[in-house]
Amino acid sequence: LHALAVLIYEYLLYRHPLKGGKYYGQIDEVEEENLMMGSKALFVEHPTDNSNRNFKREYGDNLEKFKPWTDLSKTPYTITGPYLKELFEQAFIKGLHNPIERPTADTWEQALIKTNDLKLQCSNFKCEQKWFIYNNTKDTKCPFCGTKYAHSIPVLDFYYQFKPNVWKPEN
């Protein structure tokens, strides 16, 4: 299940969730790879430990070529929407060293389906990304080009019956 989380993160954000360029000392490449992907693995977007954010070390002279994907202030994992954000945190923070905490494949599937429902087409026809995930704010704009969304957004609130005569919002 870890590989599925990594693939989804890489596919959507064009970077590896654990390869941030953390320095482990003077060791050979194989040992460094084992630490980076194993016992010392650290999510590049960990909320309290930013020691794995040395993208210059990871990408070298190609750092600029891979922007905005190497700029976490412009493309944080949170731009993937609330459903995937939660699962990335579960997979790469809570479950990184505790496999039982990782989301199931079915949970990923449901989150991807729900996220697809939040997809909006950018109002800027020149935007390289073309689409972005609605972030449920009044000032909806594309996180990639900064263009304000020019259309109205129909919003449906779904409720489920929590217990008899008690209804709660689904999201």
Where are these regions (language model features)?
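Carbohydrate-binding surfaces of carbohydrate-active enzymes
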Residues: 93
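Regulatory extensions appended to serine/threonine kinase catalytic cores
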Residues: 79, 83-90, 98-171
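Conserved C-lobe activation region of Hanks-type protein kinase-like domains
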Residues: 1-2, 7-85
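Activation segment of ePK-like protein kinases, specifically the conserved APE
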Residues: 16-17, 96-99
